[in-house]
Amino acid sequence: MAEEPQTVLQLPPSSAAGGEGLTDVSPETTTPEPPSSAAVSPGTEEPAGDTKKKIDILLKAVGDTPIMKTKKWAVERTRTIQGPIDFIKKFLKLVASEQLFIYVNQSFAPSPDQEVGTLYECFGSDGKLVLHYCKSQAWG
């Protein structure tokens, strides 16, 4: 089975006002390698092991929520879950009044201030963190 293209999710600095500045870096194909040495972005050298700076997240739609064509993204390990939530809302062009629910491994909703790196260490598998997103409450 062919590997899915991966895109680096560039989130603005935490101090940026208005949440603007999200950019989408062109996708690159990944090769089947051990998770600790998987490439994240062009020209980026990562330390071996669990100390890599970016975490691969796999975004899966639930229910009637629109499916994103690019499902695999790379996010800095120090980012909070609120960053990907804001990005998904903007990417799906959701109105400010619409809610977006994020679930880790179809089981629980992490708090918006939870760091992606911590979630990956506890619940990541196969070198990525699986996040399910939906517009209505699905689990827990």
Curated annotation (Swiss-Prot):
* Lineage, uppermost ranks: Eukaryota, Metazoa, Chordata, Craniata, Vertebrata
Function (record text): Ubiquitin-like protein involved in autophagy vesicles formation. Conjugation with ATG5 through a ubiquitin-like conjugating system involving also ATG7 as an E1-like activating enzyme and ATG10 as an E2-like conjugating enzyme, is essential for its function. The ATG12-ATG5 conjugate acts as an E3-like enzyme which is required for lipidation of ATG8 family proteins and their association to the vesicle membranes. The ATG12-ATG5 conjugate also negatively regulates the innate antiviral immune response by blocking the type I IFN production pathway through direct association with RARRES3 and MAVS.
- Recorded protein name is Ubiquitin-like protein ATG12
Annotated membrane topology is: Peripheral membrane protein
Q: Which SUPFAM superfamilies match?
A: Ubiquitin-like (SSF54236)
Gene3D superfamilies per UniProt? Phosphatidylinositol 3-kinase Catalytic Subunit, Chain A, domain 1
Keywords recorded for this protein, A-Z: Acetylation, Autophagy, Cytoplasm, Immunity, Innate immunity, Isopeptide bond, Membrane, Ubl conjugation pathway
GO function term, MF aspect, one:
Atg8-family ligase activity
Spell out the post-translational modification annotation for this entry.
Answer: Acetylated by EP300.
